[in-house]
């Protein structure tokens, strides 16, 4: 087997890798389009001269400008932090499907509220709208990865959850180029800066429409005791009959996992809270998941996403249009590399190796960019002077950092957090993981303007140092999860050393699979047997007169 081969825990029929599973993942990932667009458009929009003129920006002190910029950006993260936790009761009681619908609805209300802002009304509507939009995307960032991971076959689970990350990058790409387009084609006016705010309504509207046609997660239906509908949905998604041996295995694994959860943690709404506080194993995994998002945000990605014009100015680029163009190219690079990660890397190269390679390469690039700024002091040069050779090299290493970071730390923490928890604590665990992402996101975005003002080149050294530390964390604490069924994740955290756990669990799964199929063959199992059992079960379920 090559290092770039798909890892299957058992023989998987080709019907399982069908268009339906990709369509469901794509519709759910309009959530991440909302997030990506918001993270990309806001920093560039508030840098437009038309926005500054509308709100009398130039009359403010530099400190006040930095404070308002930070507030506009960080209120969104604050809302997202709380939205991630509000999503837990929605996902538990209403399901993944309707939870996503409510998240999109709240986001749409927030986006609509922002459209009422102008110079006379002030920034209050933008502040309020950003909080509501944050609540919506925070809830969506909790539910979407869970929904997709619960639908996905193990061998392509990383790829399918990666569609969520792809949606993020497509939304970001649109956000970057919308701002470049309005700056390049429209005269400074209210219309120029309000258009990027209005475009937020497109991905949320598509999600509101699309969610009406998707299927509920079978695993959530099993959890809620709606077994018949769960089996029906699972068969529809897999495109296999209920008596196929693959379906028998999967349903049996889900039943076994739920029975284990019922006898240990319990299946109620409050049971996961008790389990988290009383079970060190679950608490430890929550720590790992939250730390992955600390290292992700510690790479500097959100400082760049939200304040890209400031970042490029620190390297020596001048002019709003030039910064917007460079930011747009940054978005293109991220999107292209995300496709590579999605199609070839995440389920073939695996999670651990990607994280370590990305951190090592990205750290080197940031050290070089920071060293250039320290030595050359590009911000002190003539604003009309073109980039010199050192500046061009710094831009090259910035984009090379993007190539290292994007297929490693951008989406992989979301994939791992969606798959490494037991079914009954998965919603709560994902809420904690998503909440931690938005907490670190908030802290970075809130203080980035002040960091660039005070630290200058030191900002790049700071993020480069954190990327080095993340390598040590991943090597010693994070197991590989590719190709492992959700119901078998516990084993990964029981074997030591952690870097050998994946091979041991996979070998055990294949041994169990071979034994199961041998037992099935020796029992003389046929499809007609399964159909007869199903008919008997249906007959027994009919009420007697």
Curated annotation (Swiss-Prot):
GO terms for molecular function: carbohydrate:proton symporter activity. The keyword Magnesium does not apply. The chain crosses the membrane at residues 23-43, 67-87, 98-118, 131-151, 160-180, 194-214, 286-306, 326-346, 353-373, 385-405, 458-478. It is a multi-pass membrane protein. Ubiquitinated. Deubiquitinated by creB, probably to control its activity or amount. GO terms for cellular component: plasma membrane. GO terms for biological process: quinate metabolic process. It is found in: Cell membrane. Keywords: Cell membrane, Membrane, Quinate metabolism, Transmembrane, Transmembrane helix, Transport, Ubl conjugation. The keyword Transmembrane applies. Residues 44-66, 119-130, 181-193, 307-325, 374-384, 479-545 are extracellular. Residues 520-545 are annotated as: Disordered. It comes from the Eukaryota. Residues 1-22, 88-97, 152-159, 215-285, 347-352, 406-457 are cytoplasmic. It holds the Pfam family Sugar_tr. PANTHER family: MAJOR FACILITATOR SUPERFAMILY (MFS) PROFILE DOMAIN-CONTAINING PROTEIN-RELATED, PLASTIDIC GLUCOSE TRANSPORTER 4. Integral membrane transporter that imports quinic acid to be catabolized as a carbon source. Belongs to the major facilitator superfamily. Sugar transporter (TC 2.A.1.1) family. Interacts with creB. This is Probable quinate permease. The lineage of its organism: Eukaryota, Fungi, Dikarya, Ascomycota, Pezizomycotina. The gene is qutD.
């Amino acid at each position: 087997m090559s290092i770039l081969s798909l890892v299957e825990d058992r023989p998987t029929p080709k019907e399982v890798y069908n268009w339906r599973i990709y369509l469901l993942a794509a519709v759910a990932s309009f959530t991440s389009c909302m997030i990506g667009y918001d993270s990309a458009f806001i920093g560039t929009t508030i840098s437009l001269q038309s926005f500054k003129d509308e709100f009398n920006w130039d009359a403010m002190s530099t400190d006040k400008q930095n404070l308002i910029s930070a507030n506009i950006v960080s209120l969104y993260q604050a809302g997202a932090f709380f939205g991630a936790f509000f999503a837990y009761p929605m996902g538990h009681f209403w399901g993944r499907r309707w939870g996503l619908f409510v998240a999109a609805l709240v986001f749409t209300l927030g986006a609509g509220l922002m459209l009422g802002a102008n110079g006379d009304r002030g920034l209050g509507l933008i502040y309020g709208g950003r909080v509501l939009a944050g609540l919506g995307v925070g809830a969506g960032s909790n539910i979407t990865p869970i929904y997709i991971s619960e639908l996905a076959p193990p061998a392509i689970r990383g790829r399918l959850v990666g569609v969520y990350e792809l949606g993020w990058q497509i939304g970001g790409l649109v956000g970057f180029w919308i701002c470049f387009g309005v700056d390049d084609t429209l005269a400074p006016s209210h219309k120029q800066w309000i258009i990027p705010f209005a475009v937020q309504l497109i991905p949320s509207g598509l999600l509101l429409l699309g969610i009406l046609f998707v299927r509920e997660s079978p695993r959530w239906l099993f959890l809620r005791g709606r077994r018949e509908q769960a089996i029906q949905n699972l068969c529809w998604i897999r495109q296999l009959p209920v008596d196929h041996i693959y379906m028998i295995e999967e349903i049996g694994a889900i039943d076994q996992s739920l029975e284990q959860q019922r006898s240990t943690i319990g299946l109620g709404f409050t049971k996961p809270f008790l389990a988290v506080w009383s079970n060190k194993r679950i608490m430890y995994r929550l720590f790992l998941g939250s730390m992955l998002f600390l290292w992700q945000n510690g790479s500097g990605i959100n400082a760049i996403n939200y304040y890209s014009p400031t970042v490029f100015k620190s390297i020596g680029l001048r002019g709003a249009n030039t910064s917007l163009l460079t930011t747009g190219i940054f978005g293109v690079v991220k999107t292209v590399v995300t496709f590579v990660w999605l199609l070839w890397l995440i389920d073939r190269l695996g999670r651990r190796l990607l994280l370590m390679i990305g951190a090592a390469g990205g750290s080197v690039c940031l050290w070089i960019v920071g060293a250039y700024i320290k030595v050359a002091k590009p911000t002190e040069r003539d604003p009309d002077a073109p980039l010199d050779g050192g500046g061009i090299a710094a831009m090259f290493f910035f984009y090379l950092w993007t190539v290292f970071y994007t297929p490693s730390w951008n989406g992989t923490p979301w994939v791992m957090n969606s798959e490494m928890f037991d079914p009954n604590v998965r919603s709560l665990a994902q809420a904690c993981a998503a909440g931690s992402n938005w907490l670190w996101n908030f802290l970075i975005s809130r203080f980035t303007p002040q960091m660039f003002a005070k630290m200058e080149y030191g900002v790049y050294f700071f993020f480069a140092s954190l990327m080095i530390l993340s390598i040590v964390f991943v090597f010693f604490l994070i197991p590989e999860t590719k190709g492992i069924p959700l119901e078998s994740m516990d084993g990964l955290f029981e074997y030591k050393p952690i870097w050998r756990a994946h091979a041991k669990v996979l070998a055990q799964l294949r041994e169990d699979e071979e034994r199961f199929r041998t037992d099935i063959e020796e029992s003389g199992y046929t499809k007609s047997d399964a159909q007869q059992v199903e008919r008997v079960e249906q007959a027994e379920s009919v009420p007697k007169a």
